């Protein structure tokens, strides 16, 4: 059998690999705080209580929604920057789901992870970092917003270091 025939048959048998997701059910990275609140109210998987589940993070000036889950979901965390969802964290119920089953399903759907170690498996695209972590947690992160936040934090640290050095120089 010619090698070209083998190549085409093995390619046909391989399932199509999708990019890592930017959404879970009706909640997607980039949604506004109000859109996420509305989606949480409408989805029975979340036990969203309204504003008592919303916090303001004073150091970063960001909002965080934290709510209990039901069924397979223990808790959900939704972090915003400039009014847009950029981190979605789902803590899964280890009594109902296991790490191996989730990893196997994700690998079948999204291909081999770009990073894999005992603590996490990470799938990435240009815009999304999707990870399965231990304990049983799934994270969706908007990479562009996150990297901008990290760069801002590094710039702030540089300013603080410079201010510190100038203060010390006054003595």
Residue positions per predicted region:
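Hydrophobic h-region of N-terminal signal peptides that target proteins for export
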Residues: 1-5
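Mid-chain, structured segments of secreted extracytoplasmic proteins
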Residues: 54-97
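Non-cytosolic coordination micro-motifs
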Residues: 6-53, 89-171
